[in-house]
């Protein structure tokens, strides 16, 4: 089982996404456990303040170090043995490779930043890892935590009903996912590719691989550059590039 401990000043934000669909089923099966911790519960003033003005001046408020430290000590989050992740725009960009690495742990702690930022001592003294879900600004780390929990949970054995589902998701193979179709085979003149109706699984597998290479090359060529392509992949990709060149030259 993989346990997530999420520290947030707004834990109620997680009620809906964690109480339905795949994540709810995974929790019901005992495959993952999600514990929410309200950072305000670890404050000592009557207003339960988790933020304060920055030393030296400047706009905005910063998350205070004391309540975060107390929360981590209360839940026994030992940064020497488990990932204690600060969700921040300054962190390592989250991707499938990071998700796969995190899924191998039995416990992950997520600290959701908020306000203008966090006291630097949270970053340096309490967290042992920083992760960002992209180069854009969000109100807080809660949305980032939802993304991370969902992505990592899918990789926990037993969470997905079909063992092949995770393996064929976009990015799991380093490529974007190939096109997929379901019934009916024709609708308003829009037909499913004949190869998928042929029943020839070898041909279908080759078509899917070629389409995945094509989609990745057209939309995310940077992913192709990172891959170690097999001879068959190179052959299929050459066919894709040749066809695309002919179309563009017409």
From Swiss-Prot:
Its EC number is 2.1.1.228. Pfam families: tRNA_m1G_MT (PF01746). CDD domains: TrmD-like. One of its GO terms (molecular function) is tRNA (guanine(37)-N1)-methyltransferase activity. S-adenosyl-L-methionine binds at residues 113, 133-138. It catalyses: guanosine(37) in tRNA + S-adenosyl-L-methionine = N(1)-methylguanosine(37) in tRNA + S-adenosyl-L-homocysteine + H(+). GO terms for biological process: tRNA N1-guanine methylation. Keywords: Cytoplasm, Methyltransferase, S-adenosyl-L-methionine, Transferase, tRNA processing. It is found in: Cytoplasm. Its main location: cytoplasm. One of its GO terms (cellular component) is cytosol. InterPro entries: Alpha/beta_knot_MTases, tRNA_m1G_MeTrfase_C_sf, tRNA_m1G_MeTrfase_TrmD, tRNA_m1G_MTases_N, tRNA_MeTrfase_TRMD/TRM10. It is an enzyme of class 2 (transferase). Homodimer. PANTHER family: TRNA (GUANINE-N(1)-)-METHYLTRANSFERASE (PTHR46417:SF1). Belongs to the RNA methyltransferase TrmD family. Specifically methylates guanosine-37 in various tRNAs. This is tRNA (guanine-N(1)-)-methyltransferase.
């Amino acid at each position: 089982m993989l346990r997530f401990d999420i520290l947030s000043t707004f834990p109620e934000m997680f009620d809906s996404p964690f109480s339905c669909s795949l994540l709810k089923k995974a929790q019901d099966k005992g495959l993952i456990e999600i514990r929410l911790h309200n950072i305000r519960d670890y404050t000592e003033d009557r207003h339960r303040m988790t933020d304060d003005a920055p030393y030296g001046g400047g706009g905005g408020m910063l998350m205070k170090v004391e309540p975060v430290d107390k929360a981590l000590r209360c839940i026994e989050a030992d940064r020497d043995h488990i990932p204690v992740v600060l969700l921040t725009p300054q962190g390592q960009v989250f991707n499938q490779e990071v998700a796969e690495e995190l899924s191998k742990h039995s416990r992950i702690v997520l600290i959701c930043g908020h306000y203008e930022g966090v006291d630097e001592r949270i970053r340096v003294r309490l967290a042992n890892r920083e992760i960002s879900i992209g180069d854009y600004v969000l109100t807080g780390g809660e949305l980032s935590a939802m993304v991370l929990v969902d992505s990592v949970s899918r990789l926990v054995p037993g969470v997905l009903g079909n063992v092949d589902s995770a393996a064929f998701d976009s990015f799991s193979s380093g490529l974007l996912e190939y096109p997929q179709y379901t019934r009916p085979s024709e609708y308003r003149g829009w037909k499913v590719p004949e190869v998928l109706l042929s029943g020839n699984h070898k041909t279908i597998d080759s078509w899917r691989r070629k389409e995945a290479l094509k989609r990745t090359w057209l939309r995310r060529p940077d992913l192709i550059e990172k891959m170690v392509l097999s001879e068959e992949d190179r052959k299929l990709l050459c066919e894709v590039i040749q066809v695309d060149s002919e179309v563009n030259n017409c």
